[in-house]
């Protein structure tokens, strides 16, 4: 589950994209991992796109390290051999374990969480769209607006003193 969640979040994947990843779609490189997405909701022609996920400093949360270990232990051609509906169930299960309301989380939470979190840390619209494959700036701006609710909150000066 951890590999699926870390890769899904770090790549801003749709759940259908995650469960379609095969071993041939993955290339480990010095900087991290490149994952080729053959087809997605916004790419019906099947042009495909490559998502690059860098290695993280902290191994415990590194999607690249967890993916390497997962693939070494599991020899399936499909990297995550589950249905897209099971992705949602896994997210809900771990949200509940973390003490969160599982009804507020689903498979899309990985993708929306990526967009919101990277916006909070200052990623540009263009960079977020390059990773998620969004065609609409308006959709990405929704995530950024949500992130800005706290980042640019007028109470930050008071609450941090």
Q: Which positions does each model-derived feature cover?
A:
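Conserved tyrosine-mediated DNA breakage-rejoining catalytic core shared by Y-recombinases
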Residues: 11, 16, 20-61, 69
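Basic, Lys/Arg- and aromatic-enriched nucleic-acid-binding interface segment
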Residues: 1-15
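Catalytic-site neighborhood detector that most strongly recognizes the C-terminal catalytic loop/helix
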Residues: 132-157
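Residue-level marker of regulatory loop/turn positions in helix-turn-helix DNA-binding domains and
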Residues: 7, 59, 83, 107-108, ...
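Intrinsically disordered, low-complexity basic tails/linkers immediately adjacent to helix-turn-helix/homeobox/MYB/SANT
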Residues: 159-161
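Major-groove DNA-contacting interfaces characterized by cationic-aromatic clusters
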Residues: 49-96
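Short, basic (Lys/Arg/His-rich) helix/loop patches that form interaction surfaces
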Residues: 73-78, 88-130, 137, 149
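The alpha-helix within a helix-turn-helix
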Residues: 8, 19, 129
């Amino acid at each position: 589950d951890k590999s699926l969640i870390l890769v899904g979040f770090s790549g801003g994947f749709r759940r259908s994209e995650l469960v379609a990843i095969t071993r041939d779609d993955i290339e480990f490189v010095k900087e991290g991992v490149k994952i080729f997405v053959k087809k997605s909701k916004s790419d019906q022609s099947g042009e495909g796109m490559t998502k690059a996920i860098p290695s993280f400093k902290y191994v415990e949360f590194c999607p690249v390290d967890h993916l390497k270990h997962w693939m070494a232990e599991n020899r399936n051609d499909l990297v995550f051999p589950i249905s897209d509906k099971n992705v949602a169930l896994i997210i809900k299960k771990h949200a509940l374990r973390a003490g969160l309301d599982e009804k507020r989380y689903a498979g899309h939470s990985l993708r929306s969480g990526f967009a919101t979190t990277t916006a909070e840390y200052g990623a540009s619209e263009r960079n977020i769209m390059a990773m998620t494959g969004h065609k609409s700036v308006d959709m990405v701006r929704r995530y950024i607006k949500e992130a800005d609710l706290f980042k640019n909150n007028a109470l930050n000066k008071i609450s941090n003193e």
